[in-house]
Amino acid sequence: MSDILQKILAVKAEEVAAARKHRDLPSVRAEAEANRSDSTLRARGFARAMRDKIAAGNAAVIAEVKKASPSKGVLRPNFKPADIARSYAEHGAACLSVLTDEQFFQGHADYLREARAACTLPVLRKDFMVDLYQVYEARSWGADCILLIVAALDQGLMEELEACALELGMDVLVEVHDGHELDRALRLQTPLVGVNNRNLRTFETTLDTTLGLLKHMPDDRIVVTESGILTPDDVRKMRAAAVNAFLVGEAFMRADDPGAELARLFA
């Protein structure tokens, strides 16, 4: 595990402990379960939205709402989650990914709420999930999907977090970086397998990470290529290899109009 990931996970454990003191688990769980029957907050079907785009012959784009990153700093000083979400929805995104990590990515729970309220797209809570509390918390905020990072979790906890998410009606995007992590990810139920092209130790990106894992991917999984998609050529390279699902953040966040950049990149 990289030093930065270890540092982030230590902070996450502290955040969960502090959150439990502010609002206990039974309260968060009750709110999460109540949202299953709320017409505006019930889960929107993240995996289904991805499948529908691909079935129609289109790229399924998870468009990211991200103010900053540890490696690049602030990406978008004029950061308005609702406006960004509407722009993505108008230009063909399948789903949204909203950063909720505060310390490292300058995210916030309110950004997820604002983005989801501004459109009808399903929303991923993009964060480092290490505890069941965060899964219930995500659903209580309205999240339709959570991210599980294989490098950050042991197998038992990862399967427990997935089971909780599925029970609440959410989907799960499991993220891998190499073949060993992929073997572990394929033991989960989720069809959504994200391949992060960024090396967690060097922060360098190469699309060969995704391409190299394709031969090990079962046909019933949707491969989501993450990080390093910056040009139309990158998109064409992936689609030529039958990779039709993408998670893109930086390229959109640096553009004047994120949605228009989505349309240009995936034209």
Swiss-Prot record:
Give, as in the UniProt entry, the pathway in which the protein acts: Amino-acid biosynthesis; L-tryptophan biosynthesis; L-tryptophan from chorismate: step 4/5
Keyword flag Lipid metabolism:
no
Q: What is its EC number?
A: 4.1.1.48
Q: Which PROSITE patterns match?
A: IGPS
* Gene3D superfamilies membership: Aldolase class I
Q: Which CDD domains match?
A: IGPS
Q: Which SUPFAM superfamilies match?
A: Ribulose-phoshate binding barrel
Question: In its UniProt entry, what is this protein called?
Answer: Indole-3-glycerol phosphate synthase
Q: Which organism is it from?
A: Ralstonia pickettii (strain 12J)
